[in-house]
């Protein structure tokens, strides 16, 4: 059992840390609500665009394009989304675990893997593990923007169209609710419209200027929006995870303060009791 002074110092230290975690939770809360609103708006637009393309597909329009070409897979590119800062629980660890398993699976199948990390934490893990990776997009998730999403999407589309990758995959966290961020692994290219929102009803379309022109414009736009939505979704999930981590830290601090306060009171009571016994013992001797 520590001295009264030691216990008081520990309580003061924990309360100081608690103020920091509370401030970080408030900052993450503001960023979370902003990212969530942006995600919802962008996702609505992306889903509507997907529905239009599915409607064209159901009307038997010719939507074949370089982005839908199915090939034998010998080279895979993986864009993996994480955070650039810590203190967000198991957020980055879960992504790294899934990525490590995926890389090993492809190694066993003798499939070449190209890595495109978004987030300093996942880039650090890849570096420590000795993997080579593209460093051009590591920081674009810190302040998600449509322009940065387009730059990444263009790189991934170029890899696929030029045959440098036979499949492009995305690995990220999808925000489900405050307590749950789901690790999601999906194929980005070749584009499969059957994986997107289906149109409610089949409709006869009159296409102007042409199906080819629509393909050339809508497919890249959908692929750009997909990356942008994932950047925002990852940001939303990250801030939600950090809020939960800071809340857990705050709760643990409260529990520890209660335990130390109880220990302080017991120690103080014991010290007072000992002093009284010494006084009573001295009085008995003098009498």
From Swiss-Prot:
GO molecular function, one term: proton-transporting ATP synthase activity, rotational mechanism
The protein's name: ATP synthase gamma chain
Membrane topology of the entry: Peripheral membrane protein
A biological process term (GO) from this entry: proton motive force-driven plasma membrane ATP synthesis
Gene expressing this chain: atpG
Role: Produces ATP from ADP in the presence of a proton gradient across the membrane. The gamma chain is believed to be important in regulating ATPase activity and the flow of protons through the CF(0) complex.
HAMAP family linked: ATP_synth_gamma_bact
PANTHER family, A to Z: ATP SYNTHASE GAMMA CHAIN, ATP SYNTHASE SUBUNIT GAMMA, MITOCHONDRIAL
Recorded GO CC terms: plasma membrane; proton-transporting ATP synthase complex
UniProt entry tagged with the keyword Transport: yes
Keyword rRNA-binding assigned: no
Signal peptide: none
Annotated NCBIfam families: ATPsyn_F1gamma, PRK13426.1
Oligomeric form and interacting partners: F-type ATPases have 2 components, CF(1) - the catalytic core - and CF(0) - the membrane proton channel. CF(1) has five subunits: alpha(3), beta(3), gamma(1), delta(1), epsilon(1). CF(0) has three main subunits: a, b and c.
Keywords carried by this UniProt record: ATP synthesis, Cell inner membrane, Cell membrane, CF(1), Hydrogen ion transport, Ion transport, Membrane, Transport
Localization of this protein: Cell inner membrane
Cysteines joined through disulfide linkages: none
Family: Belongs to the ATPase gamma chain family.
Main location as per UniProt: membrane
């Amino acid at each position: 059992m520590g001295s009264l002074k030691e216990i008081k110092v520990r309580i003061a230290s924990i309360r100081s840390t608690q103020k920091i975690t509370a401030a970080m939770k408030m900052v993450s809360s503001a960023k979370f609500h902003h990212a969530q609103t942006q995600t919802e708006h962008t996702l609505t637009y992306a889903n509507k665009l997907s529905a239009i393309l599915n409607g064209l597909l159901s009307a038997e329009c010719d939507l074949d394009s370089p982005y839908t070409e199915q090939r034998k897979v010998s080279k895979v590119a993986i864009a993996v989304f994480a955070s650039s800062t810590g203190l967000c629980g198991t957020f980055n660890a879960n992504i790294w675990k899934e990525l490590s398993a995926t890389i090993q699976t492809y190694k066993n199948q003798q499939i070449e893997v190209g890595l495109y990390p978004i987030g300093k934490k996942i880039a650090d893990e890849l570096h420590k593990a000795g993997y080579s990776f593209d460093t051009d997009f590591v920081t674009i998730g810190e302040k998600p923007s449509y322009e940065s999403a387009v730059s990444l999407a263009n790189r991934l589309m170029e890899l696929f169209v030029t045959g440098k990758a036979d499949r492009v995959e995305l690995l990220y966290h999808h925000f489900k609710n405050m307590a749950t961020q789901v690790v999601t692994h999906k194929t980005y290219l070749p584009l499969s419209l059957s994986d997107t929102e289906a149109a409610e009803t089949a409709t006869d379309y009159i296409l102007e200027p042409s199906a080819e022109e629509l393909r050339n414009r809508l497919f890249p736009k959908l692929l750009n929006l997909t990356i942008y939505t994932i950047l925002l979704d990852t940001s939303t999930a990250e801030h939600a995870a950090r809020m939960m981590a800071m809340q857990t830290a705050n709760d643990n601090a409260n529990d520890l303060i209660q335990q130390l306060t109880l220990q302080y009171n017991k120690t103080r009571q014991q010290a007072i009791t000992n002093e009284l016994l010494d006084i009573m013992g001295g009085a008995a001797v003098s009498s």
